[in-house]
Amino acid sequence: MSVKTKKFVNKKYTTAKFKVTPTGKCRNKNNESIKKLIFNNGTKINTGLNLLLTQPNQVNIPPPPKILLDRIREERKRMVSSANSDITVIDIELCWEIDKFLAHHFQNTDSSKNDNYTKSNIKKPINAFIAFRAYYSQLGAGIKQNILSSILSEAWNSPETDQNIWDIFAQQFNFASARCGFVNYIMAQASSAP
């Protein structure tokens, strides 16, 4: 009994099976407009791209808005003068000396927490308001969360708050995929700035 085998012949087709007609203008690979890009300080101008500033020119962390400091001061006075003497008020100096206050608290961070980093710990990207809230909520230590949240949102919407700077900080943090929190990341960036 013989087994039949099939042989496949490799046919070379010389005619196209279908035809494609472009609907618009075809882009030339040597487009003159691409060659004429204007560069200014290392960034492209008029390219239609969103550029992420990974190393901005000395963007400093802005001091807290005056309305934020005033409202926190009022809330602390209200907490002290209230009849609830069992509430412990943490007295944070309101003159906002970043180098002395925050550097002291974040100097001895535990690096062993970063060793246990897994895919399940990946966080959602933060926006500008979340960055603002995370950084300045430290000033309201001891104040109830719901009161502090309303104070921070009022400060965020005040005209003296530059929201674009916080947007840059949030984009940098999201791009870097830092394993630490936002406040630790931004303090490390501020201390390493030239």
Swiss-Prot record:
DNA-binding among keywords: yes
Subcellular location: Nucleus
Pfam families: MATalpha_HMGbox (PF04769)
Domain of life, per lineage: Eukaryota
GO biological process: one example: positive regulation of mating-type specific transcription, DNA-templated
UniProt-listed PROSITE patterns: ALPHA_BOX
Main localization (coarse): nucleus
GO CC, one annotated term: nucleus
Residues annotated to bind DNA: 121-177
MF terms (GO), sorted A to Z: DNA binding, bending; sequence-specific DNA binding
Keywords: Activator, DNA-binding, Nucleus, Transcription, Transcription regulation
Misc remark: There are three genetic loci for mating type genes in K.delphensis. MAT is the expression locus that determines the mating type of the cell, whereas HML (containing HMLALPHA1 and HMLALPHA2) and HMR (containing HMRA1) represent silenced repositories of mating type information. The mating type is determined by the MAT locus, which contains either a copy of HML or of HMR. Diploid cells are usually heterozygous for the MAT locus.
Family membership: Belongs to the MATALPHA1 family.
Role: Mating type proteins are sequence specific DNA-binding proteins that act as master switches in yeast differentiation by controlling gene expression in a cell type-specific fashion. Transcriptional activator that induces the transcription of alpha-specific genes.
Name of the protein in question: Mating-type protein ALPHA1
